[in-house]
A protein has these predicted regions:
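Cyclophilin-like peptidyl-prolyl cis-trans isomerases
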Residues: 20-265
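Bacterial N-terminal signal peptides
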Residues: 8-17
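Bacterial N-terminal signal peptides that target proteins for export
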Residues: 1-9
């Protein structure tokens, strides 16, 4: 009798096992799918609205230090990038110390750039070759793919060195020229840099010097006074590319209050 009862229980267990297994499978699959949909909708919906404002506010509120470069050809206002803090802070330090006052734009090449910041240029004789003066230290390269050598870019000069470290004081402002699609393709192949459609359009329509990208640190740009850069780039130069007539500079930090006052004039 016991044997018959055991056999009957075994048969019943075999018959019920698939049904129990099916119920176990159905419940976890069914419930999580239903419960997952509602939270996802709420999480996606609300943060999307909330996060949109802070992102816009952050961009709108980002402040840049600006410097006015006064020359006998006119004034140039440059904006220093926050993405290159070491170059920015060093430049601000030198401006506040009046390091650049009375120095020359000592190297000028039309459709390329205008260069200055050699401390020896303050007392140099006419016709003397310049460009070797410095402050005794370099700044580590700060490359960022979003910062490139478009027309008006403010960049750090440097000597040949494997780290591509920048001069502590010498800089150049890009004048450049319009770059063709073919030239950009060649630069991409040679350097491995990939240019977005926006960058390509900038180089083709406004110009620049793309062959210097990711080789020299770009740490600012001309905000106003590009016509002054063009004027300096067009002056007669000697065999050293030094302007025949000295073009001296004087720099000062533009405070936010001064900027607002100037905009009202």
């Amino acid at each position: 009798m016991n044997r018959i009862f055991k056999i009957a229980c075994l048969i019943l267990a075999i018959f019920l096992a698939p049904q129990l297994q099916a119920q176990v499978k159905k419940q976890p699959v069914k419930k999580p799918l239903i419960s997952a949909k509602k939270p996802i909708k709420k999480v996606v919906k609300k943060p999307a609205v909330k996060s949109a404002k802070p992102v816009t506010d952050t961009v709108a509120k980002e402040e840049f230090t600006k410097v006015k470069i006064s020359t006998n050809e006119g004034d140039i206002v440059i904006k220093l990038y926050n993405k290159t803090p070491q170059h920015r802070d060093n430049f601000i330090k030198l401006v506040k110390e009046h390091f650049y006052d009375s120095l020359l734009f000592h190297r000028v090449i039309s459709q390329f750039m205008i260069q200055g910041g050699d401390p020896k240029s303050k007392t140099s004789a006419a016709g003397e070759m310049l460009g070797m003066g410095d402050v005794g230290y370099t700044i580590p390269a700060e490359f960022d793919s979003s910062l490139y050598h478009k027309k008006g870019a403010l960049c750090a000069a440097r000597t040949e060195n494997p780290e591509k470290a920048s001069s502590g004081c010498q800089f150049y402002i890009v004048q450049g020229r319009n770059i063709s699609e073919g030239e950009l393709n060649n630069i991409e192949q040679q350097s491995g840099i990939k240019y977005s459609s926006a960058k390509r359009m900038t180089y083709k329509m406004k110009g620049g010097t793309p062959f210097l990208d990711m080789n020299y640190t770009v740490f600012g740009e001309v905000e106003s006074g590009m016509e002054v850069v063009n004027s300096i780039a067009a002056v007669p130069v000697d065999n050293f590319k030094r302007p025949i007539k000295d073009i001296r500079m004087r720099m000062e930090i533009i405070l936010p209050t001064e900027e607002k006052t100037d905009s009202k004039k």
